């Protein structure tokens, strides 16, 4: 099949889907390519981002947590976006694309519930019906988000098959779409899956890095030494990285969830500790058994609990343009507490992984003058009960 855009990033990516879905992916690619050239579409998208979502988001200099070091640390405040996380950016773009293609329904999958909430709010705003697949386990651990989705008119469908988490929700959503794509658009929630999704999601998130670049130049008069973002599927990270890829002086650091520790096998770090395989319509590194079955990923943060990773991250890793590291649950929790206590910001547990790595860089080299930007991809309201239970069990509260 000929595509308008390259479906691969090096060897990663592709369109490994049943033949029945090829026309849907082709139609989506055509709609996206024409929308990118359509000033009216771009103006509508920009208007929603500004007047509905609240862009541009702030770039906040940390006042206190860098004390005693020579690090200057900024946070890109995607937590201030309507909906509470970076997810809102690209769902508005995809919902507009769905309308452009004449679709009336949205299908989505969600783990932490953030993408589900974003899909529900975009659907409510633009008059689309919305059904969201969510692992039954996640439905339990993210009840506030489930209620938010339902308040905005979405149907939330708990998935009990397999491990009853995000990977199973992804499978069910794709299965639904293969029978309903004439009227429904599949609103994929991260920069992964079959082409053209990784490219679409990157382009609909790239304003994160574009704004960051302009803001840091205005505030500091130079580009940062590194930008740091957490990586599950990798959409907030690719949104931050995209505009810096050609700026070779800027380090790109992606932070995977180390869970209980890489050595325990209970983590979500397939990029550095998985094997390349085919899953969810793409060729990418993933967590798999010796026999090639997809393995359970694990993270304290439901939004990073994904057994694979977007193909462009796999490519950036393979050519050495970006560095990928991992942070454990405990390190992320420590960073979460630090930001709350010393900056008055409650970050999402996902974003806390990126922050934890920045704090590590700072503490390992207190005398090093470095300018760092962390993508604070979401707010932590959804995580306060999880954190409360852990701290209570430890006797810290």
From Swiss-Prot:
Record PTM N6-(pyridoxal phosphate)lysine, positions in chain: 87
Enzyme Commission number(s) from the entry: 4.2.1.20
Cofactor: pyridoxal 5'-phosphate
Reactions mediated catalytically: (1S,2R)-1-C-(indol-3-yl)glycerol 3-phosphate + L-serine = D-glyceraldehyde 3-phosphate + L-tryptophan + H2O
Enzyme type, top EC level: lyase
Quaternary organization: Tetramer of two alpha and two beta chains.
UniProt record similarity statement: Belongs to the TrpB family.
Protein name (Swiss-Prot/TrEMBL): Tryptophan synthase beta chain
Lineage: Bacteria, Pseudomonadati, Pseudomonadota, Gammaproteobacteria, Enterobacterales
């Amino acid at each position: 099949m000929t595509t308008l855009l390259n479906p691969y990033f090096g060897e990663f990516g592709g369109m490994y889907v049943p033949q029945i879905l090829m026309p849907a992916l082709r139609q989506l690619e055509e709609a996206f390519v024409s929308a990118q050239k359509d000033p009216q579409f771009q103006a509508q998208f920009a208007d929603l981002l500004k007047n509905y979502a609240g862009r541009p988001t702030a770039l906040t200099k940390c006042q206190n947590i860098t004390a005693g070091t020579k690090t200057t640390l900024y946070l890109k405040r995607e937590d201030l976006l309507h909906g509470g996380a970076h997810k809102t950016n690209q769902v508005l773009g995809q919902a507009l694309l769905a309308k452009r293609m004449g679709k009336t329904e949205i299908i989505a999958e969600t783990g932490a519930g953030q993408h589900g909430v974003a899909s529900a709010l975009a659907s409510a705003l633009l008059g689309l019906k919305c059904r969201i697949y969510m692992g039954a386990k996640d439905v339990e651990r993210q009840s506030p988000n489930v209620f938010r989705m339902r308040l905005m008119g979405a149907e939330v469908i708990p998935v009990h098959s397999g491990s009853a988490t995000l990977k199973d929700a992804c499978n069910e959503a794709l299965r639904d779409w293969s029978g309903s794509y004439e009227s429904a658009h599949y609103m994929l929630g991260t920069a992964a899956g079959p082409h053209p999704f990784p490219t679409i999601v990157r382009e609909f998130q790239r304003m994160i890095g574009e704004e960051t670049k302009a803001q840091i130049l205005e505030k500091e008069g130079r580009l940062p030494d590194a930008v740091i973002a957490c990586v599950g599927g990798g959409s907030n990270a690719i949104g931050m990285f995209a505009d810096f890829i050609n700026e070779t002086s800027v380090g790109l650091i992606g932070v995977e969830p180390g869970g209980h520790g890489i050595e325990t096998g209970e983590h979500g770090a397939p990029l550095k500790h998985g094997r390349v395989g085919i899953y969810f319509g793409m060729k990418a590194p993933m967590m798999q058994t010796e026999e090639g079955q997809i393995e359970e990923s694990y993270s304290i943060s439901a939004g990073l609990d994904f057994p694979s990773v977007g193909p462009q991250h796999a490519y950036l890793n393979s050519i050495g343009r970006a560095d990928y590291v991992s942070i454990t649950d405990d390190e992320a929790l420590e960073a979460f507490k630090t930001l709350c206590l010393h900056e008055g910001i409650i970050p999402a547990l996902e974003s806390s992984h990126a922050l934890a790595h920045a704090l590590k860089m700072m503490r390992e080299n207190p005398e090093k003058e470095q300018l760092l930007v962390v993508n604070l991809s979401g707010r932590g309201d959804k995580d306060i009960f999880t954190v409360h239970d852990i701290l209570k069990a430890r006797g810290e509260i």
